[in-house]
């Protein structure tokens, strides 16, 4: 998951409607038990309504209600498992960090927070619900980063090999938008089960070749991680996409359908939805310095922010120097001894909130205090430059591509492991009980 790509407003189009008359309403019920947590029927209904509303707005067709319900329940199960893991390790996105994220989103949308609130209200969405949905999305991104990142290793040999390939391609690569359908098989399947899954996959393939809508088919038939999005994996180049895709799309063009491809997970059908060329570009680097204070049982969130506000006053009045305060107070061991200096770097190497803050500053400007996952910061943008650091760019790019590919693969492995270890029971709706 890329934390810097914050949710746009459409993702918060929660389809929550209230009855206009006080008619008797059925009692809510427990629809799914997940370990010691539950999913209510109303949550499933709300998400189904959201998917339908978004599909209608995008003029997309949908499968049967039962197929859609299955996909929604699976999404809610995986979401709840991740949130339970976040609770277990004490991961919590506080109000101050949430406010900072909202300010960043408003800035990206080129509006104030008040204007953003008005826009959200005009779409019939409660701002408090927007906040809580954003808090959940940030939590999911953080728990995925914490749990999956430590499972990934990128070797120097992998980087060297990919750098060579990038150099040979002259950075003129292609990005693909991939459609993916997975027809799964049970664990330790019998030959009859394998044959049944194979027949299902071939039937799906024939329907697609006959012109059936891919997105609708994926929602109805796929067990893959992107099923609820119509099976669509957004633009990736061959070096960052899951290995399975990379191995089969070489030479493929837009519109090609590939498969079924058998793996241990089942039978895969892949369609090239779109392809676009990549272009080389100059690298913009920034030289910055910062002061970091980490909230703790001794140092509260409010106190950390207040201290940085006081530092700002001292720096602006000439009472103190940035570098001296950084050496004395900053809790970033890598930069404190250097007066807070971070050196030249691309902004994208930093956590999203830090990168966004740097991008908003002019040279010599010092930010207001802001929160990241590391703690509270103030940062000064000292210089910007554009450079033709091709070798370093290729190395960084290679590492990023390999990491993203492995992250996507390990994320799915982690989710599968959590699901396999969890107690999950799906209760049938009243209308289906005999």
From Swiss-Prot:
Gene Ontology process terms (BP): chaperone-mediated protein folding; Gram-negative-bacterium-type cell outer membrane assembly; protein stabilization
UniProt-annotated location(s): Periplasm
Gene Ontology CC terms, in alphabetical order: outer membrane-bounded periplasmic space
Span of domain PpiC: 173-274, 283-383
Signal peptide interval: 1-22
Keywords, alphabetical: Chaperone, Isomerase, Periplasm, Repeat, Rotamase, Signal
Keyword Chaperone recorded: yes
This enzyme's EC code(s): 5.2.1.8
Annotated catalysed reactions: [protein]-peptidylproline (omega=180) = [protein]-peptidylproline (omega=0)
PROSITE patterns in alphabetical order: PPIC_PPIASE_1, PPIC_PPIASE_2
GO molecular function, one term: peptidyl-prolyl cis-trans isomerase activity
Stored InterPro entries: OMP_Chaperone_SurA (IPR050280), PPIase_dom_sf (IPR046357), PPIase_PpiC (IPR000297), PPIase_PpiC_CS (IPR023058), PPIase_SurA (IPR023034), SurA_N (IPR015391), Trigger_fact/SurA_dom_sf (IPR027304)
The keyword Transmembrane helix is assigned to this record: no
Pfam families: Rotamase, SurA_N
Entry note about domains: The PPIase activity resides only in the second parvulin domain. The N-terminal region and the C-terminal tail are necessary and sufficient for the chaperone activity of SurA. The PPIase activity is dispensable for SurA to function as a chaperone. The N-terminal region and the C-terminal tail are also required for porin recognition.
Alphabetical list of PANTHER family matching this protein: CHAPERONE SURA
Protein's job: Chaperone involved in the correct folding and assembly of outer membrane proteins. Recognizes specific patterns of aromatic residues and the orientation of their side chains, which are found more frequently in integral outer membrane proteins. May act in both early periplasmic and late outer membrane-associated steps of protein maturation.
Name assigned to this protein: Chaperone SurA
């Amino acid at each position: 998951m890329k934390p810097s790509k914050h949710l746009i407003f459409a993702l918060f189009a929660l389809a929550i409607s209230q009855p206009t008359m006080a008619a008797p309403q059925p009692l809510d019920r427990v629809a799914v038990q997940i370990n010691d947590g539950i999913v209510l029927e109303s949550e499933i209904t709300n998400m189904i309504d959201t998917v339908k509303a978004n599909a209608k707005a995008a003029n997309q067709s949908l499968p049967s209600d039962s197929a859609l319900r299955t996909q929604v329940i699976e999404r809610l199960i995986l979401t709840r498992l991740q949130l339970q893991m976040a609770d277990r390790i004490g991961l919590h996105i506080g109000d101050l960090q949430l406010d900072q994220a909202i300010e960043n989103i408003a800035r990206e949308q080129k509006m104030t927070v008040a204007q953003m609130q008005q826009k959200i209200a005009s779409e019939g969405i409660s701002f408090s619900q927007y906040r809580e949905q954003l808090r959940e999305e940030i939590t999911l991104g953080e728990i995925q980063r914490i749990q999956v990142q430590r499972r990934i290793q990128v070797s120097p040999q992998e980087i060297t090999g990919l750098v060579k390939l990038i150099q040979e391609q002259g950075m003129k690569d292609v990005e693909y938008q991939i459609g993916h359908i997975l027809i799964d098989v049970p664990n330790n399947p019998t030959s009859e089960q394998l044959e049944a899954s194979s027949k299902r996959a071939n039937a799906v393939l024939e329907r697609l070749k006959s012109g059936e809508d891919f997105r609708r088919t994926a929602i109805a038939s796929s067990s893959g991680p992107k099923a609820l999005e119509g099976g669509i994996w957004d633009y990736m180049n061959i070096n960052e996409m899951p290995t399975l895709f990379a191995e089969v799309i070489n030479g493929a063009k837009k519109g090609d359908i590939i498969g079924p491809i058998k793996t241990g997970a089942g039978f895969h059908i892949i369609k090239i939805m779109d392809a676009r060329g990549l272009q080389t570009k100059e690298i913009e680097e920034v030289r910055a310095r910062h002061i970091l204070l980490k909230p703790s049982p001794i140092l509260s969130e409010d106190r950390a922010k207040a201290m940085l506000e006081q530092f700002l006053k001292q720096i602006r009045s000439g009472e103190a120097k940035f570098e001296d305060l950084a050496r004395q107070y900053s809790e970033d061991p890598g930069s404190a001894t250097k007066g807070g200096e971070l050196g030249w770097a691309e902004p994208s190497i930093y956590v999203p909130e830090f990168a966004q803050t740097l991008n908003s500053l002019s040279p010599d400007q010092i930010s207001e205090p802001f929160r990241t996952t590391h703690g509270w910061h103030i940062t000064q943008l000292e210089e910007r430059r554009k450079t033709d650091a091709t070798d370093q760019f290729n190395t960084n790019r290679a590492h990023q591509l390999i990491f993203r590919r492995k992250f996507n693969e390990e994320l799915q492995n982690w989710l599968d492991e959590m699901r396999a270890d969890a107690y999950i029971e799906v209760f049938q709706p009243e209308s289906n009980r005999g």
